[in-house]
Amino acid sequence: MSSGDPPSGLQASGSNSSAALGLSPPSAPSGKSAATPPKVATDDASVELSSMKSERSPAKSIPLGEDIMQVARIGEVSVMQKLFDEKKFTANYSDEEGITPLHWAAINNQYAMCKFLIDSGADVNAKGGESVATPAMWAAQRCHYYIVHLLLQYGADPLLTDVQGYNILHLATIDGNAFLLVLLLHQEIPVDVVDQQGHTGLMWAAYKGYPACVDLFLRWGANPNAVDDGGLAPLHWALVKGSLPCVLKILEYGADRFATTTDGKTPALVAQEMNTRHVWYRALSECGYDADGNRKVLPMGLGPYVRDKAIMSKFFFFWPFLLLFVVLWILSNMVVYFAIPVAAVAVFGLQWVAKKAASQGPSEFRIIQKTPFLAGVFAGSLFWVFVRYVLYVLPATYSTNPFLNLGFVVFFSLTTYFYFYSMVADPGYVPKLGSRNEQRAVIGQLFEEWKFDEENFCVYCMIRRPLRSKHCRRCSRCVAKHDHHCPWIDNCVGVNNLRQFVLYILCLEIGIILFLHLTFNYINGLPAPAEPICNILNDQICSFVLRDTFTLLLDVWIAIQLVWVTMLGVVQLVQVSRNQTTYENMRGHSLDRGHSSTRAFASAVTAGTTSLDAAGLSASGQGPNPALAQGGHRHRGGCLKQWSSLLGFDTFFATARDGLRDGPRAARPRNPFSRGIVTNCRDFWCDPAPYFGKREPGSAMLGGEIVNYNRMYETPSRMYSSGDYRSVAYDEAADIV
């Protein structure tokens, strides 16, 4: 099996070869089911019998109608039925190597054929091929987890092993399909079951470099310090591959950093011999250890505080308060020629302190956008606006501009309330299940509905994903009606806080405009300095600037914020009118646009039901293709792209392009949740949930009726469009504002 071959890291050049290291890597499964690279069974690409026959196969060709193996491979149920009716073969027929028709149907993802053979009496535990493997093992090596589930339902033993001692859990781990692993782990297979060399599933996942599988095993209770026959622990195997996420995750779960193999090799020595020292050192640093693996000792006993996530969250939140004050004070009290470079040095120095603290703190704070720092930037701006207004602007303008002051106080208060509510409120986390039995029941239900895929199940939260939900990597939770994760509030925006977030943006927009008006009147009413001296500006502008430079610079700063606030407000209002979230706006709706009659015909032939969705089959009659749910590799882009996302520019221009797009309206992807602008706006703004207070988790208005997005798994019938709406598949894209 190609996916089980040792990775290139084991054949390192020079002295770092596996032979020089003395390691004994897990050998790859072999046999008939591993004779060719894995292929997804489609109309024109399936595992051919001829490609997997041994050289001893007879040269004489067999007519298709009489070749039971070929019939099983291509899924011709009617032809197979005819062979059985004519008594030419039985369901338990096997060739000289013990391979049965069920093996070929399983490896080619022929669900209907597998079901027919099982109903006809086929042995689900029959072993065959050079690897002496069962049909479930063959299917597992191609990640056909619907086939595996079918076989398990009919008595397939998940603890059976092939000739090399691999059971189905090991084979599934080698291919790295998390959904198949979730299915198998819920079959009560011991998570640390070993192969003939003592390798656990966690060791295989670490060796192959599959972070998602490593995380799944560890969350399931796998032992991070288990050792194989050679004394190698999962940490050693992760360093053989050199996967940083795998090493980090294993260290996070308490792996022994000094564990030695039977020949005395520590993880550090393995990293040195496998040329993965850079991975080892970086992992140690991010986990708070020095290069020798010892816990870093910080001066003045700061270690416990710096490593405390709650304390560091507060530090990053309040640090921008100081940064803003220092910069504004320098720029307002020094000569411009000195002020600009000194302010730049101050910013660099304060940022260096923050980054230094981040490098010693929790690993999730390594990137500044993943800390509450940006939320602190806004909160700091809000704080200094309040201080300046109370101490200087209000005393000078309350008698001359009473209504303007009243308006500002109202909108400042509303902005503050809605901001902190959006930041601290539960955005709509989908409740997790209470036990593994509940998880098993949900998985079984999804298999019955042909919906066990990433659109409908989250392998991180182990829950069924409601429509419009998305798993947020930052929050590590699925959020109902997920809009986006906003770093400016350090929280997700979802069904529970979306309305408050929109109100926060709108009140902020009005508040900024009122404050700019007030401060202009305030500065204009101040007496001019007796001898204004400026190096660049003319006397008139210089006189105005020097009246209260600090307040004027604060005005410039918040006026800059007005740009992205305006764009974000426009985008949110447009999306409200469409009943659309930011994520849906950026990624689009997943619509099945296949012709209904064609799909019904194909489904009826292969699965006995006219609903292709109910059968979960492709147009060729094959089982669901797990590869179709896998997202491709994503490039995060450079600094400009990241800041464009943070400031909302990409969302604004995407919305503008969508609004100005040429062509008929019908050509656009249809949103089955939209009921027209008036109804959409009424649902959003007239929702009976309180504006000032918590709503019932997950509840919202849809078409004038109360719905709960925590439990919405089917689109309401009145919202049905020409295509079947599906929940937007989650991918780990950059944060969208």
From Swiss-Prot:
Residues 7-38 have a biased composition (Low complexity). Gene3D superfamilies: Ankyrin repeat-containing domain (1.25.40.20). Coiled coil: none annotated. Palmitoyltransferase specific for casein kinase 1. This is Palmitoyltransferase akr1. GO terms for molecular function: protein-cysteine S-palmitoyltransferase activity. It is found in: Early endosome membrane; Golgi apparatus membrane. The DHHC domain is required for palmitoyltransferase activity. ANK repeats lie at residues 97-126, 131-160, 164-193, 197-226, 230-259. SUPFAM superfamilies: Ankyrin repeat. Its main location: membrane. Residues 394-402, 522-549 are lumenal. Residues 456-506 form the DHHC domain.
